[in-house]
Amino acid sequence: MSAHAAPSPEALSRRAEFKAAKADLLERFRSATNVTSLMHALSKLTDSALKRVWDDCGLPATLALVAVGGYGRGELAPHSDVDILVLLPDAHDPALDARIERFIGMAWDLGLEIGSSVRTVAQCIEEASQDVTVQTSLLEARRIFGSTALFERFTVRYHEEALDARAFFTAKVLEMRQRHAKFQDTPYSLEPNVKESPGGLRDLQTILWIARAAGFGSSWRELDTRGLITEREARELRRNEGFLKALRARLHVIAGRRQDVLVFDLQTQAAESFGYRPTQAKRASEQLMRRYYWAAKAVTQLATILIQNIEAQLFPATSGITRVLSHDRFVEKQGMLEIVDDGVFERHPDAILEAFLLYETTRGVKGLSARTLRALYNSREIMNDTWRRDAQNRHTFMQILQQPEGITHAFRLMNQTSVLGRYLLNFRRIVGQMQHDLYHVYTVDQHILMVLRNIRRFAVAEHAHEYPFCSQLIGNFERPWVLYVAALFHDIAKGRGGDHSTLGMADARRFCREHGIGGDDAALIVWLVQHHLTMSQVAQKQDTSDPEVIKRFAAIVGNERYLTALYLLTVADIRGTSPKVWNTWKGKLLEDLYRITLAVLGGAKPDAHSELKSRQEQALALLRLETVPDDAHRALWDQLDVGFFLRHDAADIAWQTRVLYRHVNAETAIVRARPSPIGDALQVLVYVKDRPDLFAGICAYFDRNGLSVLDARVSTTRHGYALDNFIVTQTERDVRYRDIANLVEQQLATRLAETAPLPEPSKGRLSRLSRTFPITPRVDLRADERGQYYILSVSANDRPGLLYSIARVLAEHRVGVHAARINTLGERVEDIFLLDGAGLSDNRLQIQLETELLRAIAV
């Protein structure tokens, strides 16, 4: 609202009239789909309203009111800014200033979000010459009313003095690249900006601005006539532009304000407004997002073609063909792979995949030319069943997979151009498919390519420092391309409504058969697809200190090659889900499982007694290096059971022994903290007389101080002391764990000395993603195979205070926690607790405990 006096009754009446007319247009839009009609109608309604205000202010006919930006195009979204220019003659009466200010104020009073400027023609030209943003805004100037002669004079001078087509092209392309960089150069954002993201409306507007500035036309039809795009491409551009405009308009209507970001909260409503309905396999929002990603992908592809074509017109090449790459098929032209003529793919369908093999293997080629991209785009009918079954194409595809470098770039380009989905039809089904599982932050196709990229990085010397152990393993792994095939198929069956691992096996088996992959390699690929989740589930959800767990896992993998392949795929898979999911702790769990299993496969028996003896001997050797007296450990070790020594490695046993050997019968809590040996975490040791609420009390402290528990290993000594170890991370900010270790020791020891009752759990706020896509909380309590403990499995949306809420319920029922494995997967948790409690065999107590836990973890 403007800063002038309160609106008059007449202004309020006019505002109500305008609001009612706009509401009528929006209501009609809700039941129709023609967004262009809506945008034009909103522009006309705004024109009429502004004219009435202009007349009321008595502004002279020597001025002109000009619409600029989107309003200038006549494309006003429901809650867009209304950008106007009051154009003044060079010589004007300064007394007009007050009336112009009144006009702008009254326009605000209508309820319009006005963006205004007041300039002479000379000022417009001067500012446009210096600022490409002003230049762009004025490019689409449209006279609403006022002096026609003044507006025409402005238009002529603007095009003659302010607009340089080449400079404008360079500036807008740079601006587009910078904008894309803000969105990580991908249209596949979880919450895309329909206007600004790569493949969004701004890309389409940028192309039309560049074309208009160059005099090539201001519509897709005109660009088609000019020969810059084909009729088919123009049709595709109009279709996708219409969808994006409609989506943006519906977001505005649903939100009741300007809303260009397709946030989680609005995705379901937006989907339903387009008529999408949930199915058994897909949410309505997932269907809408897939449609959006396909549109953004097509816009990105066509924009690349158009920009290269316009650039070729504005900057004629000074040099032509650099070299011939494939006789009568491809040449290199200015670093781009170009077909020799537009009929290459029609004459030689096998050249389609050859293009990507050449891109992958030819040094100096940095991409595909506009001519090649266009030919690919228009070759969809060629990429049919006959093309997919062609022996040469299958051979070329395997060559692309088996090159020593360039594989990731080649497959990304194949996906961007839709060739990958045309060759592997089941891959096409998952392109743009969102996964609202609170775990993956990429669409299925992008996740698959990310996993492929991660495996490739293991094999590239320049990246060996990132994951040295993985790089070492893949360096000795024969035919690593089998891992790339497994990566392509491990999630290819997502969204089909069944077990994607089982369905993916059939796809992988068929691929191997059709591409001549031998028996052993084919068997490994199919097995990897079937078991790609197995290793992470064992490492993160089972007690790997239990020899039986290791024995069962070793039986599944069978040999070292299978174990190594599964380990490499698992690390790449977890790292390819979300930047938040992977951490060094999970890395250690997987590496430990790999090494233990490898020893078993090599003939070592998973024998608890021999493992216990080995770890104790190693720990004693470390203690001697620390100058701990020879028999000093006995007082503590005599109180510890076998489980303690199997759950901790030798270095950890030595550290805990060194801390506690003088305090075996301590009267007060002993708390020690140190940076975790695996990094990126804090290890906290607690030694104190045991009590039922101890675990919950420790969790309450961590919760209140922003520390997130990754792992808990709980032991009880023979003389009634708790010896608990926690791995925690700081949840809110980057922190040096060495700096906070002393503070944690002091605060937690003080907290444990208090006798106050457990505080009420604080139900921390869920993330927007979790609020929009809540998962059904699950609690499962059952006896373990030996009947010694009970296993509690909890699955829920992650939130601050969740672990403490669980621990408090257990404490209230005097149920002891023997061990806890905290598994955070993005926005959800899947926690496993090993419980001991005398009353847990009572079915009524089990039901009561499960009921209270469900209530505690509910959203």
UniProtKB/Swiss-Prot annotation:
Pfam families: GlnD_UR_UTase (PF08335), HD (PF01966), NTP_transf_2 (PF01909)
Cofactor(s) required for function per UniProt: Mg(2+)
Entry's EC annotation: 2.7.7.59, 3.1.4.-
Superkingdom of the source species: Bacteria
GO biological process: nitrogen fixation; regulation of nitrogen utilization
Molecular-function GO term, any one: [protein-PII] uridylyltransferase activity
Keywords per UniProt: Hydrolase, Magnesium, Multifunctional enzyme, Nitrogen fixation, Nucleotidyltransferase, Repeat, Transferase
Ranges for region Uridylyl-removing: 326-682
Record PROSITE patterns: ACT (PS51671), HD (PS51831)
Entries under InterPro entries matching the protein: ACT-like_dom_sf (IPR045865), ACT_dom (IPR002912), HD/PDEase_dom (IPR003607), HD_domain (IPR006674), NT_sf (IPR043519), PII_UdlTrfase/GS_AdlTrfase (IPR013546), Polymerase_NTP_transf_dom (IPR002934), UTase/UR (IPR010043)
Domain ACT, chain residue ranges per copy: 683-762, 791-859
Uridylyltransferase: region residues: 1-325
Record comment: activity regulation: Uridylyltransferase (UTase) activity is inhibited by glutamine, while glutamine activates uridylyl-removing (UR) activity.
Residues of the HD domain: 444-566
Reactions it catalyzes: [protein-PII]-L-tyrosine + UTP = [protein-PII]-uridylyl-L-tyrosine + diphosphate; [protein-PII]-uridylyl-L-tyrosine + H2O = [protein-PII]-L-tyrosine + UMP + H(+)
Domain text: Has four distinct domains: an N-terminal nucleotidyltransferase (NT) domain responsible for UTase activity, a central HD domain that encodes UR activity, and two C-terminal ACT domains that seem to have a role in glutamine sensing.
Role played: Modifies, by uridylylation and deuridylylation, the PII regulatory proteins (GlnB and homologs), in response to the nitrogen status of the cell that GlnD senses through the glutamine level. Under low glutamine levels, catalyzes the conversion of the PII proteins and UTP to PII-UMP and PPi, while under higher glutamine levels, GlnD hydrolyzes PII-UMP to PII and UMP (deuridylylation). Thus, controls uridylylation state and activity of the PII proteins, and plays an important role in the regulation of nitrogen fixation and metabolism.
Family per similarity comment: Belongs to the GlnD family.
HAMAP family documented for this protein: PII_uridylyl_transf
Protein name from the UniProt record: Bifunctional uridylyltransferase/uridylyl-removing enzyme
Organism per entry: Burkholderia vietnamiensis (strain G4 / LMG 22486)
Taxon lineage: Bacteria, Pseudomonadati, Pseudomonadota, Betaproteobacteria, Burkholderiales
